[in-house]
């Protein structure tokens, strides 16, 4: 039934995480839920980190909205499909319960099967992008005592009715998450394709260029380490994450957060900070953007 964490001293904010069934783990990163019980008129604020795609349903009455880059969603869709993101989003909510299924790039290719770059840094009505499936999956989740069981059943059935994804997607995912990988030319060589073909593959299935995704992974590693410490002096943590120049980290803070790290640390983000801990406990990694590639891959080079 997963694990739950309380995110506020008064117990009004909570999150839940569960693993998908093993045969779905290459496609689904996690199942999670966010609940807030706030007095009428009170609005909470939080952070949506840069991530892969996800499908999110608001159950019952409630309110949530978000700002993602220059786009403002107020209110957000009740049945929402979040495309892969390169910007942190800043959410607001009243009382609500949202349940989610995170999609890896392989899951996007297998189940959604659309050009991810067209949905990058966007939140859309899931029914418009995933017609038929969004409504059916919502109905299954609403009826279930255990959302994870409903998600597992639906995606297992969908797995039997969809074509296998290209093997190159898993190979690229592994390279994008390798902290030692810094050169696109080396990545292209190990993928046995030219850089232009690599760029097209990355945009279609991951939403962005390989260069941006390598920067996103490096930045997420640094940001998570900073949020885990109560002290200043972040230079060593930034270096450990792969930055060799502090100015590059400062630049990436503006790119991925639209603000300095010091300002981001001070923002209210109770659910996000709790999710870093709970996700690591349940799944082994604190953020979806760093969710590991399927095991057993072989990459030449």
Descriptions of predicted regions:
Residues 201, 216, 251, 267:
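Residue-level "edge-of-site" marker
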Residues 201-210, 253-261:
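HTH DNA-binding helix-turn interface
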Residues 211-216, 222:
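Amphipathic alpha-helical "recognition" segments
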Residues 221, 248-251, 255:
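Hydrophobic side chains within alpha-helical segments
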């Amino acid at each position: 039934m997963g694990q739950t964490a309380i995110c506020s001293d008064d117990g009004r904010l909570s999150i839940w995480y569960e693993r998908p069934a093993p045969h779905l783990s290459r496609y689904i990163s996690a199942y999670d839920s966010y609940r807030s019980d706030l007095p009428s008129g009170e609005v909470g604020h939080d952070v949506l980190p840069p991530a892969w795609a996800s499908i999110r349903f608001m159950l019952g009455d409630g309110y949530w909205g978000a700002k993602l880059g220059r786009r403002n969603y107020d209110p957000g869709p009740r049945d929402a499909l979040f495309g892969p993101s390169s910007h942190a989003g800043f959410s607001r909510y009243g009382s609500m319960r949202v349940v989610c299924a995170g999609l890896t790039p392989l899951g996007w290719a297998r189940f959604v099967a659309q050009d991810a770059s067209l949905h990058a840094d966007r939140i859309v009505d899931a029914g418009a992008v995933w017609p038929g499936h969004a409504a059916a999956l919502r109905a299954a989740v609403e009826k279930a005592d255990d959302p994870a069981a409903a998600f597992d059943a639906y995606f297992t059935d969908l797995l039997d009715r969809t074509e296998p994804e290209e093997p190159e997607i898993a190979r690229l995912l592994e390279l994008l998450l390798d902290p030692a990988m810094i050169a696109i030319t080396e990545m292209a060589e190990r993928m046995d394709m030219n850089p232009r073909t690599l760029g097209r593959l990355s945009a279609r299935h991951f939403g962005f260029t390989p260069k941006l995704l390598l920067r996103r992974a490096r930045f997420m590693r640094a940001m998570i380490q900073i949020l885990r410490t109560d002290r200043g002096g972040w230079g060593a943590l930034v270096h450990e994450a792969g930055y060799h120049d502090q100015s590059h980290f400062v630049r990436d803070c503006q790119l991925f957060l639209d603000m300095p790290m010091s300002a981001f640390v001070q923002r209210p983000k109770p659910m996000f900070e709790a999710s870093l801990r709970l996700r690591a406990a349940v799944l082994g990694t604190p953020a979806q953007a760093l969710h590991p590639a399927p095991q057993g891959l072989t990459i030449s080079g």
